[in-house]
Amino acid sequence: MEQKLIAVVAAALGVPTAALELETAAGEVEAWDSLGHINVISEIEAEFGVSIPIEKIADIHCIRDFLPYLGEKV
């Protein structure tokens, strides 16, 4: 399911999945700016049926940081 997470992030950012891995950080992807961050979060919430608390959004710096919010979905 980690690959599904990467695929969702890639689709939200409009980049190839091969360009991303779990440790890929926002600063490493040009499209992952503040708007891209919101797009990524929205897509993850929709795809996995989860809700990421708004106060935690700023604590997400790389793809791996989404895993705790997915719980048993991954």
Residue ranges and their predicted role:
Residues 1-41, 46-74:
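Phosphopantetheine-dependent thiolation modules in NRPS/PKS and related acyl-activating systems
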